[in-house]
Amino acid sequence: MKKRYLLGLCAASMLLMTSCEKDNLFGNAWGEKEGSVNLTVALPEMGVTRAYGEGKNATRLQYAVFRENGNELLLLENLTNTAEMKDGKASIEIKLEANVDYQFAFWADANGNSPYSVDINNHVVKVNGGIGANSENNDAFYGNCKVSLQAGTNPMNVTLVRPFAQLNIGTSDFESTKNSGFAIAKTKVKVQQAYTKLNLLTGEATDAVDYEFSLGAIPTGNFPVAGESVTYTYLSMNYLLMTADKETTTVTFTCADEAGSNTRTRSYSNVPLQRNWRTNIYGDLMTNGFSINVTISPNFADQNGVDDDPAIAEDNKEWHDQKQN
């Protein structure tokens, strides 16, 4: 899509929506041709639990406004801005020329701690390499909308969505493994063919690579599987940029002691991953007993999962122990 920059359109910088009166960015020249769009941008509703994936760290909202001009999009450069997400919401008021079609792009992430490169002017986000594993700062949300602006006030609600699959790994034999002399303190994962580029206006994920997270301290929250008589210790939690269609991939999981010198690695094939879905791999993963469960559930809402995939257990019986000097 060809894009040109529309410069000098705004007479003043945009103010975020507060209780005080807003200035008119364009003076009074437009008169009745002026419209105001009042946007309420929100994260999806999520329950309050100790599980990861509640979006609490996504406190910075970046957004850009584009004016449609035939097959072109004209960036309204002075309307590119940021807002603070409070309690999962941000309110924005923007005054624009009426009777014109606009597109908005949104991205919400962890302010100052985000592992993503955001080019909001070109509505593109890239996943940086070597992201630390098991960090909730890796969670983020995106959204877009089209507005045919009319004269007067145009209220709109926009709900952002997560472009990632959340991959969780948990084990029921954490303590017995520790008692045997291997105290797991850090983990990492490598995934074949995860995506690294997101178009905020289309939602398209591209540039797939074999992606590997670096070692990170194991998660501390509750493992997101309910209704089980067995308690699982969280070993790994990571966000992977995926498409809206379910894909299967190979996941290589490595756990290490505090020094990182004693490691154990295992691979799982045919693991299902899908945007905005949670995939759980759990069982007695560290001992000789072989019990593996894999579930995938939509929108992070169903803690029990809706799609069991027992074939994974049959495909993954090799367990490699490595001791590095």
Protein language model features and the residues they cover:
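Bacterial N-terminal signal peptides that target proteins for export
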Residues: M1-L7
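Extracytoplasmic cysteine-anchoring/structural motifs
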Residues: C20-N325
